[in-house]
């Protein structure tokens, strides 16, 4: 027996006390045998300590066997113990006693009861160690090794044995539980492991280039996921939105993202596609959708220049016969011309080269009969090929192992083991190597019983989706714990699908009303957007990205995220703003002084695309005649002027003109506006009459003067003798006639 203890080390970063305490309790099976207050009295952190680590207010204890808890013949047993002080004061030293039962647990049900602290077992001490005082915010680790030739390990039959560590301080003690598995070298059970390839939660249609560069860089989330599954026989459940995000960038995609995509394509693993954005299929079915939402077109997010490649063309030097003058150009000279590769189709963007086309994986706990039956019905005539991935906890029964290939009436199922998958997922998100060993040991124990129950029938487990980022090492440890487990052998996905289904019955499940209502609301908004989008030559420029954004917001990565309601509200507000991006500007008052003119109307278009509109005008008074409909193409991101012909009929006064914009499909765009037109058409008639009277009067006066002048000229030939007299008479006549002419 070897006892190795580590000295206390101070924690200089915020310690995840609450999370780690929960992990130690849930994964290692911590059970308090003494009053909790004596061990973990909550302590309020010092409000004045700004640089101090965040403390849990508790002292926590954990225990985990190494090697996934598997002890084969000739193996030693190494167990780690952890004490973490999350209080403001130093914790006193504790003694640790390790006990192992001589009697194997009878079933997986008894294993669950043991780990949960609901049952007891007789354990004999096989080793002991101790801890000194643990400083505030510090953690201590000790390891105890039981040699292979120790009587406690010798000649054990295959099975799962209770393992317990008792932490004692004075008269108080806490017991932490785990299990040791002695494998059976007999028959092996076919095992299929499913691992999701998903991205963190986003509220945009696709991942940006910057996000992709970060996720696919060394140590990034997507890079870690791929590294963790490389070289293993797992089945990949891939979010096609990740692949589309890379492919739509074309030649402008980050190099790391292109390399990641190439590496994914090179993996020989079987795979199937999740819904776009790993959207919540249960929420859609519970919202009453007849079918699942399909991803929308991504054309609006692509650029032509990202899908051209330079093509080298050899420049052939002319021969001497054709060119008498030698040239200095070399035959190695080349020209580069762009070659258009073409915008990829949506199918090409989303392709994952799936081994099976219709596999639906509801989030854990949501794949009950209500959702599964709705999914099968949504596939209509194709329901025979649709497979719903659900968990054994939703199958009615006594907690025994459930066949991986099953059917509930006409619904075809792939059933993964809840207990094993839960422990594997817990291990995959635990960054601490020592604490990670606890759920891995529990997974091995459950897997032993599952293989024993299943015999030659296939088993299915998952390393489920994670709400937090997990490291490559943690995820790979969980994957290897399943794929390399004793008594199992990797089963191809095609073999699992082709296996005869066993009849089972699913429980209904509990609907998540909040997510169902959110799905219904966003879908209703989408219908309004689809009507508005008829202003475009290609409505999918708007509806496509919006649909993909909805699916991303419905993504399972948002589960448990407190900011998800805000993401839903932001998505709905964005749709409202898009619908409001085209409309009439409030018209100004117009003075109409003539019988005909134009009514200026301005159309606001905030979209980056030209929009097709028809302006309908309707006067509310017969004094004004307005052109009923004027068609216009409004320029993108600008205000466009429309001139509506108007004509006054009779009378003067104020006339309201109702203005409506409609799309070519007849959908009203924006709100109705009213233009005030002041008609002054009679002033024009009065002005013309006065002007005509003045012109006519001037013409008459001119004509009279001309006639009189000619008469006088005719009398000039009667004699020069009378000229003087005539001149005098004319002068007198003129003097007397002038006042009369003026009148």
Indicate where each model-derived feature is located.
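C-terminal region of N-terminal signal peptides and the immediate post-cleavage residues
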Residues: 32-58, 68-70, 89, 168, ...
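Catalytic grooves of carbohydrate-active enzymes
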Residues: 82, 220, 224-234, 335-357, ...
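Asparagine-centered strand-capping/turn motif at beta-strand->loop junctions
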Residues: 82-90, 602-607
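Terminal connector regions
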Residues: 111, 150-185, 567, 650-713, ...
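Intrinsically disordered, low-complexity Pro/Gly/Ser/Thr-rich segments with frequent PxxP/GP/PP motifs
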Residues: 115-153, 625-650
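Active-site beta->alpha N-cap acidic-glycine motif
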Residues: 178-273
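Membrane-proximal extracellular "stem/stalk" segments
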Residues: 537-685
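Cytoplasmic C-terminal tails of single-pass
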Residues: 711-743
């Amino acid at each position: 027996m070897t006892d190795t203890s580590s000295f206390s080390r101070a924690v200089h970063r915020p310690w995840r006390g609450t999370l780690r305490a929960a992990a130690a309790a849930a994964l290692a099976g911590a059970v308090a045998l003494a009053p909790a207050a004596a061990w973990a009295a909550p302590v309020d952190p010092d409000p004045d300590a700004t640089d101090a680590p965040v403390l849990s207010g508790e002292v926590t204890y954990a225990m985990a066997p190494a090697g996934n808890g598997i002890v084969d013949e000739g193996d030693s047993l190494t167990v780690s113990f952890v004490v973490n002080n999350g209080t403001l004061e130093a914790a006193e030293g504790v003694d640790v006693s390790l006990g192992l039962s001589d009697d194997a647990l009878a079933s997986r049900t008894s294993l669950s009861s043991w780990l949960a602290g609901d049952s007891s077992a007789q354990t004999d001490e096989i080793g002991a160690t101790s801890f000194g005082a643990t400083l505030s915010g510090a953690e201590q680790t000790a390891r105890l090794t039981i040699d292979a030739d120790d009587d406690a390990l010798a000649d054990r039959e295959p099975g799962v044995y209770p393992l317990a560590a008792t932490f004692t301080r004075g008269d108080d003690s806490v017991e932490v539980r785990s299990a040791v598995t002695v494998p059976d070298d007999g028959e092996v059970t076919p095992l299929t492991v499913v691992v999701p390839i998903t991205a963190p939660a986003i509220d945009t249609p696709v991942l940006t280039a910057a996000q992709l560069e970060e996720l696919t860089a060394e140590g990034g989330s997507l890079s870690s996921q791929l590294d963790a599954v490389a070289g293993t026989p797992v089945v990949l459940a891939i979010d096609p939105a990740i692949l589309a995000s890379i492919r739509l960038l074309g030649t402008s995609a980050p190099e790391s993202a292109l390399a990641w995509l190439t590496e994914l394509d090179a993996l020989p693993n079987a795979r199937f596609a999740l819904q776009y954005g790993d959207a919540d299929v249960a929420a859609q079915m519970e919202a009453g959708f007849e079918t699942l939402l399909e991803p929308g077109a991504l054309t609006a997010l692509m650029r032509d220049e990202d899908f051209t490649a330079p093509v080298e063309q050899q420049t052939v030097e002319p021969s001497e016969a054709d060119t008498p003058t030698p040239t200095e150009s070399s035959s190695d000279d080349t020209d580069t011309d762009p070659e258009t590769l073409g915008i990829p189709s949506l199918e090409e963007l989303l392709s994952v080269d799936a081994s099976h086309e219709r596999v639906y994986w509801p989030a854990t706990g949501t794949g009950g009969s209500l959702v599964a039956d709705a999914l099968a019905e949504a596939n209509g005539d194709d329901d025979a090929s649709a497979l719903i991935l659900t968990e054994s906890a939703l199958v009615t029964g006594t907690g025994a192992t459930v066949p991986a290939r099953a059917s509930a009436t006409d619904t075809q199922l792939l059933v993964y083991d809840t207990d094993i998958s839960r422990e594997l997922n817990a291990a995959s998100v635990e960054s601490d190597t020592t604490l990670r060993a606890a759920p891995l040991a529990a997974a091995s124990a459950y897997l032993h019983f599952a293989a024993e129950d299943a015999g030659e029938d296939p088993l299915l487990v998952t390393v489920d989706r994670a709400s937090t980022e997990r490291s490559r090492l943690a995820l790979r440890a969980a994957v290897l714990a399943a794929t390399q487990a004793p008594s199992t052998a990797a089963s191809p996905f095609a073999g699992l699908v082709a296996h005869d289904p066993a009849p089972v019955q699913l429980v209904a499940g509990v609907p998540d009303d909040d997510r169902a209502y959110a799905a219904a609301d966003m879908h209703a908004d989408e219908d309004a957007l689809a009507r508005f989008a008829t202003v475009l030559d290609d409505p999918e420029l708007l509806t496509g990205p919006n649909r993909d954004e909805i699916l991303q917001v419905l993504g399972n990565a948002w589960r448990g995220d407190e900011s998800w309601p805000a993401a839903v509200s932001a998505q709905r507000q964005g749709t409202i703003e898009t619908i409001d991006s085209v409309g009439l500007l409030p018209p100004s008052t117009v003075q109409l002084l003539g019988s005909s003119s134009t009514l200026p109307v301005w159309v606001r278009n905030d979209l980056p695309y030209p929009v097709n509109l028809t302006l309908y005008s309707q006067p509310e008074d017969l004094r004004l005649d307005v052109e009923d409909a004027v068609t216009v193409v409004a320029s993108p991101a600008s205000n466009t002027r429309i001139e509506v012909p108007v004509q006054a009929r009779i009378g003067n006064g104020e006339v309201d003109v109702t203005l409506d914009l409609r799309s070519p499909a007849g959908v009203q765009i924006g709100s109705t506006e009213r233009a005030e037109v002041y008609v002054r058409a009679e002033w024009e008639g009065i002005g013309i009459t006065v002007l005509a009277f003045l012109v006519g009067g001037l013409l008459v006066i001119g004509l009279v003067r001309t006639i009189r002048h000619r008469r006088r000229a005719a009398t000039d030939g009667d004699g020069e003798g009378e000229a003087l007299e005539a001149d005098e008479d004319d002068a007198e006549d003129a003097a007397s006639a002038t006042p009369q002419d003026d009148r």
